[in-house]
Amino acid sequence: MARYNLKAAARTLTRQKLRGRAANMWRYAEVLPARDPVSLGEGMTPLIAARHLGARLGLDGLFIKDEGLNPTGSFKARGMSAAVSRAKELGARMLAAPTAGNAGGALAAYAAKAGIPCVIVMPRDTPAANVMECEAFGADVRRLDGLISDCGQFVSENKEREGWFDVSTLKEPYRIEGKKTMAYELWEQMGGKLPDVIIYPTGGGVGLIGMCKAFEEMETMGWIGKKRPRMVVVQATGCAPIVEAFERGAKNADFWENAATIASGLRVPKALGDFLILAGVRETGGAALAVSDREMLEAGKELASQEGIFAAPEGAATVVAAAKLAERGWIKRKERLVLFNTGCGYKYAEAWARALGDW
């Protein structure tokens, strides 16, 4: 992973100096890898107090970090801004990555902004909105039979011959750097403190890994003490390798056969950084649980009608997880809890249309 001179960073990266900086993730430049960023204004997404939903769940300190308001409609913009910025500085001439949806749109947009061609490899059943988005940004879209793991194998097997700079999840160190800024923003938005609990929808898990890295950096710079938020992984019942590994006490997850879920970002049968995700959950006293597609869609409808947030199914899954953990008493009424909506619901129009038709 990327490392920084945090002693030097601490001298200039202060709350007072942050007040005068641009409201995007590059405000934390001292702990980011590029000096000449390729930016579309990503970051500084709102942290919204969910009072109506919190009242129903018996949670007084419930907040939603709405990453669906990033450029290209998901948190993937953060990682791709950092990765494409650094790839450009390193002289990359062609970028490539597999995707189940939102990462592809983000890569295509930032590659277009940087003036670098890109190849995006998708499962054939990727939602049409994601495919059209990538094509609109000028990407070379390849669609394959299989899952994202098969698409990743295609990139790996062809990148040397084709001269592709591989920006696949955890195949380069920079996407983590962009996504870790979610933790820095939480610290700022919560008045120099962190929440007691974070619930995060987890496929590849880079966002969770990045936030755990940010907490270490923040402690080294003197921003926080040793206490961490309890990190909670939520996955789909149709693809829950991290949950299964957590429950059996394993350090690594097994490949999840026949992965299937409406939440394309959670349909990752084997996360490359599974051991880092599991360590992050266990070291913070966190938890891992799976929810059904039906539960996600019902929670998404409630979130939209009660709080005005049209979430991706992945984001809606965090609402289900919060309800289950609150019911068990694992989350206390007065604790501060942040749910991450990682994407915009508009990209799932087909799924929503089917679900609303069923209702």
Name each model feature, range by range.
Residues M1-W359:
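PLP-dependent amino-acid enzyme catalytic core
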